[in-house]
Amino acid sequence: MKLKEVLKKLEYNILNGNIEIDIENIQYDSRNIKKNDIFFAIQGYSTDGHKFIESAIEKGAKVIVFDKGFENENMYKDITFIKVKNSRKALAVAASNYYGNPKDKLKLIGVTGTNGKTTSTFMIKSILEEAGFKVGLMGTILNYIGDRKIYAQRTTPESLEIHKLFKDMVDSGVDYCVMEVSSHSLYLDRVYGIEFNEGIFTNLTQDHLDFHKTFENYYNSKLMLFKNSINSVINIDDNYGERILKEIEEKTFTYSIKKYSDLKAESVRLHSRGGEFTVDFKGNKEKINIHIPGEYNVSNALGSILACVNEGISLKVIKRGLEKLSGVPGRCEIVTMGYNLGYDVIVDYAHTPDGLDNVLRTARDFTKGKLISVYGCGGDRDRAKRPIMGRIGTELSDLAILTSDNPRTEEPFSIIDDIVKGVTKDNYIIVQSRREAIKKAMTIAKKDDVIVVAGKGHEDYQILKDKTIHFDEREVIKEIIEELY
Protein backbone atom coordinates (compact mmCIF):
# COMPACT_ATOMS: atom_id res chain seq x y z
CA MET A 1 0.00 0.00 0.00
CA LYS A 2 1.25 3.48 -0.82
CA LEU A 3 2.36 5.50 2.19
CA LYS A 4 0.36 8.50 1.03
CA GLU A 5 -2.83 6.38 1.21
CA VAL A 6 -2.03 5.32 4.77
CA LEU A 7 -1.53 8.97 5.76
CA LYS A 8 -4.80 10.27 4.26
CA LYS A 9 -6.67 12.80 6.45
CA LEU A 10 -3.55 13.39 8.55
CA GLU A 11 -1.59 16.60 8.97
CA TYR A 12 2.15 15.89 8.91
CA ASN A 13 5.59 17.13 7.95
CA ILE A 14 7.98 15.04 5.85
CA LEU A 15 11.40 15.45 7.43
CA ASN A 16 13.13 12.93 5.20
CA GLY A 17 12.15 10.66 2.28
CA ASN A 18 8.84 10.73 0.39
CA ILE A 19 5.29 9.41 0.62
CA GLU A 20 5.10 7.69 -2.79
CA ILE A 21 6.75 4.54 -1.45
CA ASP A 22 5.04 1.21 -0.69
CA ILE A 23 4.83 -0.06 2.86
CA GLU A 24 4.00 -3.54 4.15
CA ASN A 25 2.51 -3.45 7.66
CA ILE A 26 1.80 -0.91 10.40
CA GLN A 27 3.44 -1.52 13.77
CA TYR A 28 3.63 0.34 17.09
CA ASP A 29 5.67 -2.39 18.84
CA SER A 30 9.24 -2.38 17.55
CA ARG A 31 9.58 -6.08 18.39
CA ASN A 32 7.11 -6.92 15.62
CA ILE A 33 8.84 -4.90 12.89
CA LYS A 34 9.67 -6.61 9.61
CA LYS A 35 11.18 -5.31 6.38
CA ASN A 36 9.37 -2.32 4.80
CA ASP A 37 7.02 -1.78 7.75
CA ILE A 38 5.91 1.60 9.08
CA PHE A 39 6.64 2.21 12.78
CA PHE A 40 4.50 4.55 14.88
CA ALA A 41 6.37 5.71 17.98
CA ILE A 42 3.73 6.20 20.67
CA GLN A 43 3.96 7.10 24.34
CA GLY A 44 2.83 4.09 26.37
CA TYR A 45 1.79 3.85 30.02
CA SER A 46 5.12 2.41 31.18
CA THR A 47 7.46 3.06 28.24
CA ASP A 48 7.89 5.42 25.30
CA GLY A 49 8.01 4.07 21.75
CA HIS A 50 10.30 6.92 20.72
CA LYS A 51 13.11 5.09 22.55
CA PHE A 52 12.83 2.24 20.06
CA ILE A 53 12.98 4.15 16.77
CA GLU A 54 16.55 3.08 16.02
CA SER A 55 15.71 -0.52 16.96
CA ALA A 56 12.77 -0.42 14.54
CA ILE A 57 15.04 0.86 11.76
CA GLU A 58 17.57 -1.91 12.43
CA LYS A 59 14.77 -4.47 12.06
CA GLY A 60 13.73 -3.11 8.66
CA ALA A 61 11.26 -0.27 9.24
CA LYS A 62 11.03 1.88 6.13
CA VAL A 63 8.95 4.70 7.63
CA ILE A 64 8.97 6.27 11.09
CA VAL A 65 6.03 8.32 12.36
CA PHE A 66 6.76 10.22 15.57
CA ASP A 67 5.73 13.33 17.48
CA LYS A 68 8.69 14.26 19.68
CA GLY A 69 12.26 13.86 20.74
CA PHE A 70 14.02 12.22 17.78
CA GLU A 71 16.71 14.30 16.11
CA ASN A 72 18.79 11.71 14.23
CA GLU A 73 16.69 11.47 11.08
CA ASN A 74 19.53 12.86 8.95
CA MET A 75 21.60 9.77 9.83
CA TYR A 76 19.16 7.54 7.94
CA LYS A 77 18.98 8.70 4.32
CA ASP A 78 16.90 5.71 3.18
CA ILE A 79 14.24 6.10 5.85
CA THR A 80 11.15 8.29 5.54
CA PHE A 81 10.51 10.32 8.70
CA ILE A 82 7.04 11.77 9.28
CA LYS A 83 6.47 14.24 12.12
CA VAL A 84 2.91 14.52 13.44
CA LYS A 85 1.29 16.48 16.24
CA ASN A 86 0.04 13.37 18.08
CA SER A 87 1.31 9.95 17.06
CA ARG A 88 -1.47 8.10 18.92
CA LYS A 89 -4.16 9.92 16.95
CA ALA A 90 -2.11 9.47 13.79
CA LEU A 91 -1.93 5.71 14.44
CA ALA A 92 -5.72 5.53 14.80
CA VAL A 93 -6.33 7.35 11.51
CA ALA A 94 -3.61 5.43 9.65
CA ALA A 95 -4.87 2.07 10.94
CA SER A 96 -8.34 2.84 9.66
CA ASN A 97 -6.94 3.86 6.26
CA TYR A 98 -4.72 0.77 6.08
CA TYR A 99 -7.64 -1.60 6.62
CA GLY A 100 -9.94 0.23 4.21
CA ASN A 101 -11.89 2.26 6.79
CA PRO A 102 -14.04 -0.69 7.94
CA LYS A 103 -15.56 1.43 10.74
CA ASP A 104 -17.62 3.20 8.09
CA LYS A 105 -19.20 -0.12 7.05
CA LEU A 106 -20.37 -1.10 10.54
CA LYS A 107 -22.98 0.22 12.94
CA LEU A 108 -21.21 0.80 16.25
CA ILE A 109 -22.56 0.77 19.80
CA GLY A 110 -20.17 1.78 22.59
CA VAL A 111 -20.70 1.24 26.33
CA THR A 112 -18.70 3.09 28.97
CA GLY A 113 -18.90 3.26 32.76
CA THR A 114 -17.07 1.89 35.78
CA ASN A 115 -19.33 -1.16 36.05
CA GLY A 116 -21.84 -2.85 33.77
CA LYS A 117 -19.99 -2.62 30.45
CA THR A 118 -19.59 -6.34 29.89
CA THR A 119 -23.12 -7.30 30.90
CA SER A 120 -24.57 -4.51 28.75
CA THR A 121 -22.62 -5.55 25.65
CA PHE A 122 -23.71 -9.19 26.05
CA MET A 123 -27.33 -8.05 26.43
CA ILE A 124 -27.15 -5.86 23.32
CA LYS A 125 -25.49 -8.64 21.31
CA SER A 126 -28.28 -11.04 22.25
CA ILE A 127 -30.98 -8.51 21.30
CA LEU A 128 -29.40 -7.62 17.95
CA GLU A 129 -28.97 -11.29 17.07
CA GLU A 130 -32.61 -11.92 17.92
CA ALA A 131 -33.43 -9.08 15.50
CA GLY A 132 -31.59 -10.97 12.75
CA PHE A 133 -28.30 -9.07 12.67
CA LYS A 134 -24.82 -10.57 12.64
CA VAL A 135 -22.98 -9.03 15.59
CA GLY A 136 -19.37 -8.50 16.59
CA LEU A 137 -18.34 -7.74 20.16
CA MET A 138 -15.19 -6.24 21.69
CA GLY A 139 -14.86 -6.60 25.43
CA THR A 140 -13.13 -7.58 28.63
CA ILE A 141 -13.88 -11.28 28.37
CA LEU A 142 -13.87 -12.06 24.68
CA ASN A 143 -14.04 -10.54 21.26
CA TYR A 144 -16.69 -12.11 19.06
CA ILE A 145 -17.13 -12.13 15.31
CA GLY A 146 -20.59 -13.63 15.08
CA ASP A 147 -20.26 -16.89 17.05
CA ARG A 148 -16.47 -17.07 16.66
CA LYS A 149 -14.58 -16.28 19.88
CA ILE A 150 -11.30 -14.37 20.01
CA TYR A 151 -9.83 -14.02 23.50
CA ALA A 152 -9.29 -10.43 24.67
CA GLN A 153 -6.09 -9.11 26.24
CA ARG A 154 -7.61 -5.89 27.63
CA THR A 155 -10.94 -4.07 27.66
CA THR A 156 -10.21 -1.99 24.57
CA PRO A 157 -7.28 -2.95 22.30
CA GLU A 158 -4.93 -0.42 20.68
CA SER A 159 -6.36 1.36 17.64
CA LEU A 160 -4.41 -0.88 15.24
CA GLU A 161 -6.04 -4.03 16.64
CA ILE A 162 -9.45 -2.35 16.74
CA HIS A 163 -9.41 -1.55 13.03
CA LYS A 164 -8.05 -5.03 12.22
CA LEU A 165 -11.00 -6.49 14.15
CA PHE A 166 -13.37 -4.14 12.33
CA LYS A 167 -11.99 -5.40 9.00
CA ASP A 168 -12.38 -9.02 10.06
CA MET A 169 -15.95 -8.26 11.09
CA VAL A 170 -16.77 -6.58 7.79
CA ASP A 171 -15.20 -9.46 5.86
CA SER A 172 -17.37 -11.87 7.89
CA GLY A 173 -20.59 -9.98 7.13
CA VAL A 174 -21.07 -8.39 10.55
CA ASP A 175 -23.73 -5.66 10.73
CA TYR A 176 -23.18 -4.29 14.26
CA CYS A 177 -20.15 -4.11 16.53
CA VAL A 178 -20.87 -3.67 20.25
CA MET A 179 -17.86 -2.39 22.20
CA GLU A 180 -16.81 -1.90 25.79
CA VAL A 181 -15.11 1.50 25.71
CA SER A 182 -12.80 2.01 28.69
CA SER A 183 -11.61 5.34 30.07
CA HIS A 184 -8.06 4.31 29.15
CA SER A 185 -9.02 3.79 25.51
CA LEU A 186 -10.72 7.18 25.34
CA TYR A 187 -7.87 9.03 27.02
CA LEU A 188 -5.21 7.21 24.97
CA ASP A 189 -7.01 7.84 21.65
CA ARG A 190 -7.50 4.14 20.90
CA VAL A 191 -11.00 4.91 19.60
CA TYR A 192 -10.05 8.27 18.06
CA GLY A 193 -11.92 9.00 14.83
CA ILE A 194 -14.64 6.42 15.49
CA GLU A 195 -18.26 7.59 15.49
CA PHE A 196 -20.74 5.50 17.45
CA ASN A 197 -24.41 5.15 16.54
CA GLU A 198 -25.17 4.73 20.24
CA GLY A 199 -23.02 5.67 23.23
CA ILE A 200 -24.21 4.26 26.56
CA PHE A 201 -23.25 5.51 30.03
CA THR A 202 -23.82 2.99 32.85
CA ASN A 203 -22.33 4.67 35.95
CA LEU A 204 -19.20 6.27 37.38
CA THR A 205 -17.63 5.21 40.66
CA GLN A 206 -14.08 5.02 42.00
CA ASP A 207 -11.57 3.09 39.90
CA HIS A 208 -8.40 3.63 37.84
CA LEU A 209 -7.18 6.60 39.89
CA ASP A 210 -3.70 5.09 39.62
CA PHE A 211 -3.93 6.05 35.94
CA HIS A 212 -6.17 9.12 35.85
CA LYS A 213 -4.89 10.62 39.16
CA THR A 214 -8.13 12.53 39.84
CA PHE A 215 -11.80 11.62 39.62
CA GLU A 216 -12.38 14.66 37.41
CA ASN A 217 -9.86 13.33 34.87
CA TYR A 218 -11.61 9.96 35.01
CA TYR A 219 -14.98 11.61 34.35
CA ASN A 220 -13.65 13.73 31.49
CA SER A 221 -12.23 10.63 29.81
CA LYS A 222 -15.64 8.94 29.94
CA LEU A 223 -17.31 12.08 28.61
CA MET A 224 -15.31 11.84 25.37
CA LEU A 225 -17.45 8.91 24.14
CA PHE A 226 -20.56 11.07 23.97
CA LYS A 227 -18.85 13.75 21.93
CA ASN A 228 -18.41 11.07 19.27
CA SER A 229 -21.84 9.42 19.45
CA ILE A 230 -24.91 10.14 17.34
CA ASN A 231 -27.21 9.13 20.22
CA SER A 232 -26.21 9.27 23.90
CA VAL A 233 -28.03 6.86 26.22
CA ILE A 234 -27.56 7.99 29.82
CA ASN A 235 -28.31 6.42 33.21
CA ILE A 236 -29.68 9.31 35.26
CA ASP A 237 -29.84 7.27 38.47
CA ASP A 238 -26.12 8.07 38.56
CA ASN A 239 -25.21 11.66 39.50
CA TYR A 240 -22.58 11.78 36.78
CA GLY A 241 -25.24 10.79 34.27
CA GLU A 242 -27.14 13.94 35.23
CA ARG A 243 -23.95 15.93 34.72
CA ILE A 244 -23.29 14.42 31.29
CA LEU A 245 -26.76 15.56 30.18
CA LYS A 246 -25.80 19.16 30.97
CA GLU A 247 -22.43 18.97 29.22
CA ILE A 248 -23.19 17.40 25.85
CA GLU A 249 -25.19 18.81 22.99
CA GLU A 250 -25.70 15.55 21.13
CA LYS A 251 -29.04 13.76 20.99
CA THR A 252 -29.65 12.33 24.48
CA PHE A 253 -31.94 9.61 25.82
CA THR A 254 -32.32 8.80 29.51
CA TYR A 255 -33.09 5.66 31.49
CA SER A 256 -33.77 5.10 35.17
CA ILE A 257 -35.19 2.79 37.79
CA LYS A 258 -36.01 5.65 40.17
CA LYS A 259 -36.63 8.83 38.15
CA TYR A 260 -38.80 10.11 35.34
CA SER A 261 -36.92 9.32 32.13
CA ASP A 262 -37.31 8.27 28.50
CA LEU A 263 -37.26 4.63 29.62
CA LYS A 264 -38.14 3.63 33.18
CA ALA A 265 -38.38 0.24 34.85
CA GLU A 266 -41.62 -0.37 36.72
CA SER A 267 -42.86 -3.22 38.93
CA VAL A 268 -39.32 -4.50 39.49
CA ARG A 269 -39.14 -7.93 41.15
CA LEU A 270 -35.77 -9.49 41.94
CA HIS A 271 -34.85 -13.07 42.82
CA SER A 272 -31.75 -15.24 43.15
CA ARG A 273 -31.66 -16.21 39.48
CA GLY A 274 -32.57 -12.87 37.90
CA GLY A 275 -35.44 -10.42 37.85
CA GLU A 276 -38.49 -9.13 36.03
CA PHE A 277 -39.76 -5.64 35.31
CA THR A 278 -42.02 -3.72 32.97
CA VAL A 279 -40.94 -1.00 30.56
CA ASP A 280 -43.13 1.57 28.88
CA PHE A 281 -41.72 3.32 25.83
CA LYS A 282 -44.06 5.83 24.19
CA GLY A 283 -47.14 3.81 25.14
CA ASN A 284 -45.69 0.41 24.23
CA LYS A 285 -45.45 -1.77 27.35
CA GLU A 286 -43.55 -5.01 27.73
CA LYS A 287 -42.78 -7.26 30.69
CA ILE A 288 -39.12 -8.28 30.61
CA ASN A 289 -37.37 -11.19 32.33
CA ILE A 290 -33.59 -11.29 32.78
CA HIS A 291 -31.51 -14.21 34.04
CA ILE A 292 -28.82 -12.20 35.86
CA PRO A 293 -29.64 -11.14 39.44
CA GLY A 294 -29.37 -7.66 40.92
CA GLU A 295 -31.07 -4.30 40.55
CA TYR A 296 -27.95 -2.98 38.83
CA ASN A 297 -28.51 -5.54 36.07
CA VAL A 298 -32.03 -4.20 35.59
CA SER A 299 -30.29 -0.86 35.00
CA ASN A 300 -27.88 -2.48 32.52
CA ALA A 301 -30.87 -3.99 30.73
CA LEU A 302 -32.59 -0.58 30.50
CA GLY A 303 -29.59 1.00 28.78
CA SER A 304 -29.41 -1.93 26.38
CA ILE A 305 -33.13 -1.73 25.64
CA LEU A 306 -33.05 2.01 24.99
CA ALA A 307 -30.08 1.80 22.61
CA CYS A 308 -31.77 -1.00 20.67
CA VAL A 309 -35.08 0.89 20.52
CA ASN A 310 -33.12 3.80 19.02
CA GLU A 311 -31.85 1.35 16.40
CA GLY A 312 -35.42 0.54 15.39
CA ILE A 313 -35.86 -2.79 17.20
CA SER A 314 -39.28 -3.53 18.68
CA LEU A 315 -39.83 -4.19 22.38
CA LYS A 316 -41.13 -7.68 21.59
CA VAL A 317 -37.87 -8.61 19.85
CA ILE A 318 -35.87 -6.96 22.65
CA LYS A 319 -37.81 -9.01 25.23
CA ARG A 320 -36.99 -12.26 23.42
CA GLY A 321 -33.32 -11.29 23.04
CA LEU A 322 -32.89 -10.54 26.74
CA GLU A 323 -34.72 -13.67 27.83
CA LYS A 324 -32.47 -15.84 25.65
CA LEU A 325 -29.36 -14.58 27.47
CA SER A 326 -28.80 -17.15 30.22
CA GLY A 327 -25.97 -15.24 31.92
CA VAL A 328 -22.60 -13.54 31.48
CA PRO A 329 -19.36 -15.31 32.44
CA GLY A 330 -18.04 -14.10 35.78
CA ARG A 331 -20.88 -11.69 36.37
CA CYS A 332 -22.90 -12.78 39.43
CA GLU A 333 -22.36 -16.32 38.15
CA ILE A 334 -23.57 -19.14 40.41
CA VAL A 335 -20.96 -21.83 39.79
CA THR A 336 -22.27 -24.53 42.15
CA MET A 337 -25.60 -25.20 40.47
CA GLY A 338 -26.13 -28.94 40.11
CA TYR A 339 -23.86 -29.91 43.01
CA ASN A 340 -26.55 -29.90 45.73
CA LEU A 341 -24.15 -28.53 48.35
CA GLY A 342 -26.84 -26.76 50.35
CA TYR A 343 -25.06 -23.45 49.80
CA ASP A 344 -24.23 -21.40 46.69
CA VAL A 345 -20.89 -20.04 45.48
CA ILE A 346 -21.05 -16.95 43.26
CA VAL A 347 -18.12 -15.74 41.17
CA ASP A 348 -18.16 -12.06 40.23
CA TYR A 349 -15.72 -9.61 38.61
CA ALA A 350 -16.50 -6.94 41.26
CA HIS A 351 -13.14 -5.23 41.76
CA THR A 352 -14.31 -1.71 42.63
CA PRO A 353 -16.04 -0.39 45.77
CA ASP A 354 -19.33 0.07 43.92
CA GLY A 355 -19.08 -3.30 42.21
CA LEU A 356 -18.44 -5.08 45.52
CA ASP A 357 -21.29 -3.18 47.18
CA ASN A 358 -23.68 -4.15 44.36
CA VAL A 359 -22.90 -7.86 44.29
CA LEU A 360 -22.95 -8.24 48.08
CA ARG A 361 -26.26 -6.38 48.44
CA THR A 362 -27.71 -8.50 45.65
CA ALA A 363 -26.51 -11.71 47.30
CA ARG A 364 -27.80 -10.55 50.70
CA ASP A 365 -31.31 -10.20 49.25
CA PHE A 366 -31.54 -13.93 48.57
CA THR A 367 -29.27 -15.31 51.32
CA LYS A 368 -31.26 -17.21 53.95
CA GLY A 369 -28.19 -18.14 55.99
CA LYS A 370 -24.86 -16.33 56.29
CA LEU A 371 -23.14 -14.31 53.57
CA ILE A 372 -19.42 -15.02 53.22
CA SER A 373 -17.24 -12.87 50.96
CA VAL A 374 -13.80 -13.73 49.59
CA TYR A 375 -11.92 -10.85 47.98
CA GLY A 376 -8.75 -8.78 47.72
CA CYS A 377 -7.46 -5.85 45.67
CA GLY A 378 -5.15 -5.80 42.67
CA GLY A 379 -1.52 -4.81 43.05
CA ASP A 380 -0.04 -1.78 41.26
CA ARG A 381 -3.53 -0.31 40.97
CA ASP A 382 -5.60 2.38 42.71
CA ARG A 383 -4.56 2.09 46.37
CA ALA A 384 -7.20 4.55 47.57
CA LYS A 385 -10.01 2.09 46.97
CA ARG A 386 -8.50 -0.65 49.19
CA PRO A 387 -9.69 0.57 52.62
CA ILE A 388 -13.08 1.45 51.10
CA MET A 389 -13.45 -2.13 49.88
CA GLY A 390 -12.32 -3.34 53.30
CA ARG A 391 -15.17 -1.43 54.93
CA ILE A 392 -17.79 -2.49 52.35
CA GLY A 393 -16.90 -6.17 52.43
CA THR A 394 -16.97 -6.46 56.21
CA GLU A 395 -20.09 -4.33 56.66
CA LEU A 396 -22.14 -6.28 54.10
CA SER A 397 -20.87 -9.80 54.88
CA ASP A 398 -21.29 -11.97 57.94
CA LEU A 399 -17.71 -13.08 57.34
CA ALA A 400 -15.11 -11.56 55.00
CA ILE A 401 -12.06 -13.58 53.98
CA LEU A 402 -9.37 -11.18 52.76
CA THR A 403 -6.96 -12.63 50.22
CA SER A 404 -4.83 -11.97 47.13
CA ASP A 405 -6.06 -10.71 43.76
CA ASN A 406 -3.38 -10.25 41.09
CA PRO A 407 -0.76 -8.80 43.48
CA ARG A 408 1.62 -8.08 40.58
CA THR A 409 4.82 -6.48 41.92
CA GLU A 410 3.43 -5.68 45.38
CA GLU A 411 3.67 -7.89 48.44
CA PRO A 412 0.27 -9.59 48.97
CA PHE A 413 0.23 -8.91 52.72
CA SER A 414 0.99 -5.22 52.11
CA ILE A 415 -2.13 -4.98 49.93
CA ILE A 416 -4.19 -6.79 52.56
CA ASP A 417 -2.89 -4.37 55.21
CA ASP A 418 -4.25 -1.49 53.10
CA ILE A 419 -7.64 -3.23 52.89
CA VAL A 420 -7.74 -3.81 56.67
CA LYS A 421 -7.24 -0.06 57.30
CA GLY A 422 -10.87 0.50 56.29
CA VAL A 423 -12.33 -2.33 58.36
CA THR A 424 -14.51 -1.28 61.31
CA LYS A 425 -15.71 -4.75 62.41
CA ASP A 426 -13.90 -7.88 63.55
CA ASN A 427 -15.75 -10.30 61.26
CA TYR A 428 -12.83 -11.02 58.96
CA ILE A 429 -9.95 -13.42 58.59
CA ILE A 430 -6.88 -13.24 56.35
CA VAL A 431 -5.93 -16.14 54.07
CA GLN A 432 -3.26 -14.94 51.66
CA SER A 433 -3.53 -17.83 49.16
CA ARG A 434 -6.62 -17.23 47.04
CA ARG A 435 -7.23 -20.95 46.55
CA GLU A 436 -6.98 -21.61 50.27
CA ALA A 437 -9.25 -18.63 50.99
CA ILE A 438 -11.96 -20.08 48.73
CA LYS A 439 -11.48 -23.51 50.33
CA LYS A 440 -11.75 -21.96 53.81
CA ALA A 441 -15.06 -20.31 52.87
CA MET A 442 -16.41 -23.60 51.49
CA THR A 443 -15.30 -25.44 54.63
CA ILE A 444 -17.11 -22.93 56.85
CA ALA A 445 -20.30 -22.65 54.74
CA LYS A 446 -23.46 -24.35 55.96
CA LYS A 447 -26.94 -24.91 54.53
CA ASP A 448 -28.53 -21.77 53.01
CA ASP A 449 -25.27 -19.79 53.15
CA VAL A 450 -23.95 -17.91 50.11
CA ILE A 451 -20.27 -17.39 49.27
CA VAL A 452 -19.34 -14.49 46.98
CA VAL A 453 -15.85 -14.77 45.46
CA ALA A 454 -15.22 -11.28 44.09
CA GLY A 455 -12.57 -9.60 41.98
CA LYS A 456 -11.63 -11.96 39.16
CA GLY A 457 -14.86 -13.19 37.60
CA HIS A 458 -14.09 -14.41 34.09
CA GLU A 459 -10.30 -14.19 34.51
CA ASP A 460 -8.42 -17.48 34.28
CA TYR A 461 -5.08 -16.26 35.61
CA GLN A 462 -3.37 -14.80 38.67
CA ILE A 463 -0.61 -12.21 38.15
CA LEU A 464 2.22 -12.64 40.65
CA LYS A 465 5.48 -10.74 41.07
CA ASP A 466 7.54 -12.78 38.64
CA LYS A 467 5.00 -14.80 36.66
CA THR A 468 1.40 -15.25 35.61
CA ILE A 469 -0.19 -18.57 36.58
CA HIS A 470 -3.35 -20.29 35.40
CA PHE A 471 -6.12 -19.68 37.92
CA ASP A 472 -9.74 -20.22 36.89
CA GLU A 473 -12.04 -19.92 39.90
CA ARG A 474 -14.65 -22.21 38.35
CA GLU A 475 -12.02 -24.95 38.05
CA VAL A 476 -10.68 -24.22 41.53
CA ILE A 477 -14.15 -24.47 43.08
CA LYS A 478 -14.84 -27.75 41.26
CA GLU A 479 -11.52 -29.17 42.54
CA ILE A 480 -12.34 -28.09 46.10
CA ILE A 481 -15.78 -29.73 45.87
CA GLU A 482 -14.08 -32.98 44.85
CA GLU A 483 -11.64 -32.64 47.77
CA LEU A 484 -14.29 -31.84 50.38
CA TYR A 485 -17.16 -34.02 49.28
UniProtKB/Swiss-Prot annotation:
Kinase as UniProt keyword: no
InterPro entries, sorted: Folylpolyglutamate_synth_CS, Mur-like_cat_sf, Mur_ligase_C, Mur_ligase_C_dom_sf, Mur_ligase_cen, Mur_ligase_N, MurE/MurF_N, UDP-N-AcMur-Glu-dNH2Pim_ligase
EC number(s) per entry: 6.3.2.13
Chain sites annotated for binding UDP-N-acetyl-alpha-D-muramoyl-L-alanyl-D-glutamate: S30, T155, T156, S182, R190
Biological process (GO), any one: cell division
Catalytically driven reaction(s): UDP-N-acetyl-alpha-D-muramoyl-L-alanyl-D-glutamate + meso-2,6-diaminopimelate + ATP = UDP-N-acetyl-alpha-D-muramoyl-L-alanyl-gamma-D-glutamyl-meso-2,6-diaminopimelate + ADP + phosphate + H(+)
Purpose of the protein: Catalyzes the addition of meso-diaminopimelic acid to the nucleotide precursor UDP-N-acetylmuramoyl-L-alanyl-D-glutamate (UMAG) in the biosynthesis of bacterial cell-wall peptidoglycan.
Sites bearing N6-carboxylysine, chain numbering: K222
Pathway: Cell wall biogenesis; peptidoglycan biosynthesis
Protein name: UDP-N-acetylmuramoyl-L-alanyl-D-glutamate--2,6-diaminopimelate ligase
Motif Meso-diaminopimelate recognition motif mapped to chain: 405-408
Binding of ATP, residues: G113, T114, N115, G116, K117, T118, T119
Predominant place of localization: cytoplasm
Residues where meso-2,6-diaminopimelate binds: R381, D405, N406, P407, R408, G455, E459
Organism: Clostridium tetani (strain Massachusetts / E88)
PANTHER family documented for this protein: MUR LIGASE FAMILY MEMBER, UDP-N-ACETYLMURAMOYL-L-ALANYL-D-GLUTAMATE--2,6-DIAMINOPIMELATE LIGASE MURE HOMOLOG, CHLOROPLASTIC
Record's GO cellular component terms: cytoplasm
Keywords, ordered alphabetically: ATP-binding, Cell cycle, Cell division, Cell shape, Cell wall biogenesis/degradation, Cytoplasm, Ligase, Magnesium, Nucleotide-binding, Peptidoglycan synthesis
PTM entry text: Carboxylation is probably crucial for Mg(2+) binding and, consequently, for the gamma-phosphate positioning of ATP.
NCBIfam families xref list: murE, PRK00139.1-2, PRK00139.1-4
